[in-house]
C-alpha cells in the first residue's frame, strides 16, 4: 500500500485523485488549506493565491478569523473524505492560543468525531507561536494515537526548531512529524530524529535530493513519503525515493509502511 502522507486539499478533488493514479499511489493523507495555487493559470493569479499562504506563514493572523477559517477548511476536508473514503485519510488543524480545556474540546469536536488521524499542519510564524504548541502537546496526552504535524521550514527558525525538539522530548507519548525535514536545518533534525523515539521525518519540500538521501540512510524507519501537493508532485517525490534507495523493503516502508504503522491503519 503506497500512501502519500502529506497532501493539501486540491480542487476539484478529482484532479487530486488523477494525480494519485498517475503516480501509482493508493491513498493520501489530506490536510486542510486556505490558498489553492492549483487554480492559478497566470503568474498574477499565482501571486494572489500565495499571498494568502504567506500571511499564514508569517503569523499575520486574527484569532477569531483564524478559527472560522479552520472550521470552513475542516468542512471542505470532511466533504472530500466522505466522498472518497477509499482514497483519503485526514489530519485537522487546531487553533493556537486556546487554553487547555478549549483545545481538548476542539480536538473532540473537529478531530476525534470526524475520525481524523492526526493534528496539523501547524505553521508557526515566530518562536512565540512554537512555544504555544505546548498546549497542543498537553491536550494530546489524552489522545496519544494522534500525531502532530509541524511545518519546520521557513519561517521557522533554528531556535524555533530547538523549542519544538524540547517539547518532543518533554512529551514522549506524542508522536511528532517534522514537516519538510527542517529546511536548511535538516542536519539538526535528522540527528534529533535518530535519537528520539517519538520523532518522524516528512520528506516533502526538501531543497535537495541529498537531504532525502541522508534521511533515508540515517533513519529509514522514520521517513514518511509525501509530496506536499499541490506544491509538489506525488509522482516525482515517489520516483526520487525509488531512485535514491535500492532496498525494496526500505522503499516499501517509506512509501507506506512507516505511516501505516504510525497511524495504526491496519491495512
Language model feature labels by segment:
Residues 1-72:
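An N-terminally biased module of ancient metal coordination in phosphate/nucleic-acid-related enzymes
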Residues 1-5, 15-27, 31, 142, ...:
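Mid-to-C-terminal alpha-helical segments outside catalytic/metal-binding sites
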Residues 2-5, 29-32, 91-92, 120, ...:
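Active-site neighborhood of phospho(di)ester-bond hydrolases with catalytic His/Asp-centered motifs
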Residues 6, 20, 77, 110, ...:
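Conserved, mostly hydrophobic/aromatic
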Residues 6-14, 36-39, 66-70, 95-102, ...:
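Acidic-and-aromatic substrate-binding clefts and catalytic sites of carbohydrate-active enzymes
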Residues 16-19, 73-80, 103-110, 132-139, ...:
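A general structural detector for well-ordered alpha-helical segments in enzyme core domains, enriched
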Residues 48-149, 155:
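Active-site gating/metal-coordination segments in enzymes
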Residues 117-118, 125-224:
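Catalytic pocket-lining loop regions of alpha/beta-barrel enzymes
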